[in-house]
UniProtKB/Swiss-Prot annotation:
GO terms for biological process: mRNA processing; RNA splicing; tRNA processing. This is Maturase K. One of its GO terms (cellular component) is chloroplast. Usually encoded in the trnK tRNA gene intron. Probably assists in splicing its own and other chloroplast group II introns. It comes from Adenostoma fasciculatum (Chamise).
Length: 504
């Protein structure tokens, strides 16, 4: 954010919280163009970069106020190549640019909070894989876990109202409301969950959804911190502190005192409650009894319904013992597997044999959902038998091999933290054989004949990818290399879940 602060002239607009002047700045859409839109698609339009000007942006925005906006006729498509490529291209540009503008207050608050608390920025914590070492370290001491699907708003106006607390610019909010009303059908009674996380325009909707979730999570964090701080306080003093909270003017405390009875705070005196969220799913885990977990569950439901105005069914939130339940999270099946070890102790003439039971965090590759994902994109059938990718048969041999290798490399990279590699090897086998069948189909030959003619060098990249990466990490230790190749490795450069791994 520091790189763009001077360029965007934020100091001038930040004084009055005005964001709408930035809508007419060309470099905002250049940033959105670089970050959000597909460069190869846009450059296919003849003369796109020459027509990308402030006049074009103003014309695009003015179309939003017309009666038949967002509808382009065939004549318009022929006259304007910029708008003729895709009917929704200009609306996507406006939404991407608007998302960049609305992100400014959030980014500035984040930078100021980091500077105030003197927190050193750690870019490694952005990685999805950084969550798993936390689970591995904390979950071994916990007993109960609950999978929670975060409810999404049934009306997009709720998202706009939530954003109002962060963005103090009415003009920008009116533009957002108009945009949602005209293009995304604001009056729809039901907003599908997949629509919020869709790839058609993820930046704007992820911003709105995350601001909505951030609001209730801030209240959850406040209650969690206060309940942990007052864990040993007697109930009488505790209720006195509640009345004291009502007199203070913190947003989380006001919401809490207005929406919930004071006695409910007594339920949450648990210092071992852990909360993890990614996209629309969260995990609650605790060391205490199932009764306390059940109270936390109903607290979340009341928080969603009374404050966030979203409906949730308590019966769909299940509480399970961590030792007997697998958690499906971030494309992994995670569980706590008991690891039994026998220890022999000898003291003088007496010897003792003790069974030592320890919990081990186990992460598995979900083979069945992955095969379904591969079958959906035509790499195999529903039974997992490899088939040729007919859509790629017209490409060159190099492009076909490169595509398969990149998919296999990404899956191996993402599932490097698996405790057991057998399922991952099966997925790689499906991709390798599908690649060979695609090449054989292109050359009108059988798989056996094609392999005999080209030999084993054809698929060397499939086999050597992990060894090459690990040889850079452990260049002189062959035993360590083999050990880590079989074990778990968490990478700190994975910023989004793999498409094939996202089965939800």
């Amino acid at each position: 954010m520091e790189e763009f602060q001077g360029y965007l002239e934020l100091d001038k607009y930040q004084q009055h919280d005005f964001l709408y002047p930035l809508i007419f700045r060309e470099y905002i859409y250049a940033l959105a163009y670089d970050h959000g839109l597909n460069r190869s698609i846009l450059l296919d339009n003849v003369g796109y970069e020459n027509k990308y000007s402030l006049l074009i942006i103003k014309r695009l925005i003015s179309r939003m106020y017309k009666q038949n906006n967002f509808i382009i006729s065939a004549n318009d498509s022929n006259q304007n190549k910029f708008l003729g490529y895709n009917k929704n291209l200009y609306s996507q540009m406006i939404s991407e640019g608007f998302a960049v503008i609305v992100e400014i207050p959030f980014s500035l608050r984040l930078v100021s909070s980091l500077e105030a608390t003197e927190i050193v920025k750690s870019y490694n914590l952005r990685s999805i894989h950084s969550i798993f070492p936390f689970l591995e370290d904390k979950f071994s001491h916990l007993n109960y876990v609950s999978d929670v699907l975060i409810p999404y708003p049934i009306h997009l106006e709720i998202l706009v109202q939530t954003l109002r607390y962060w963005v103090k610019d009415p003009s920008s909010l009116h533009l957002l409301r108009l945009f949602l009303h005209e293009y995304y059908n604001l009056n729809s009674l039901i907003t599908p969950n997949k629509f919020i996380f869709s790839k058609s325009n993820p930046r704007l909707f992820l911003l709105l959804y995350n601001s909505h979730v951030c609001e209730y999570e801030s209240i959850l964090l406040f209650i969690r911190n206060q309940s942990s701080h007052l864990r040993l306080t007697s109930s009488g003093i505790f209720f006195e502190r509640i009345h004291f909270y009502e007199k203070r003017k913190y947003p989380g405390e006001e919401v809490f005192s207005n929406d919930f009875p004071s006695a409910i705070l007594w339920f949450f005196k648990d210092p071992f409650m852990h909360y993890v969220r990614y996209q629309g799913k969260s995990i609650l885990a605790s060391k205490d009894s199932a009764l306390l977990m059940n109270k936390w569950k109903y607290y979340l439901v009341n928080l969603w319904q009374c404050h966030s105005y979203v409906w949730s069914q308590p019966g769909r939130i299940c509480i399970n013992q961590l030792s007997k339940h697998s958690i499906y999270f971030l494309g992994y099946f995670s569980s706590m597997r008991p690891n039994l070890s026998v220890v022999r102790s000898q003291m003088l003439e007496n010897s003792f044999i003790m069974d030592n039971a320890m919990k081990k965090f186990d992460t598995l590759v979900p083979i069945i959902p992955l095969i379904r994902s591969l079958a959906k994109v035509k790499f195999c059938n529903t039974l997992g038998h490899p088939i040729s990718k007919s859509a790629w048969a017209d490409s060159s041999d190099f492009d076909i091999i490169d595509r398969f290798v990149r998919i296999c490399r990404n899956l191996s990279h993402y599932y490097s933290g698996s405790s057991r590699k057998k399922s991952l090897y099966r997925i790689k086998y499906i991709l390798r054989l599908s690649c060979v069948k695609t090449l054989a189909r292109k050359h009108k030959s059988t798989v056996r004949t094609f392999l005999k003619r080209l030999g084993s060098k054809l698929l060397e990249e499939f086999f050597t990818e992990e060894q090459q990466i690990l040889s850079l990490i452990f260049p002189r230790a062959s035993y360590t290399l083999k050990k880590f190749y079989r074990g778990r490795i968490w990478y700190l450069d994975i910023f989004c879940i793999n498409d094939l791994a996202n089965h939800e």
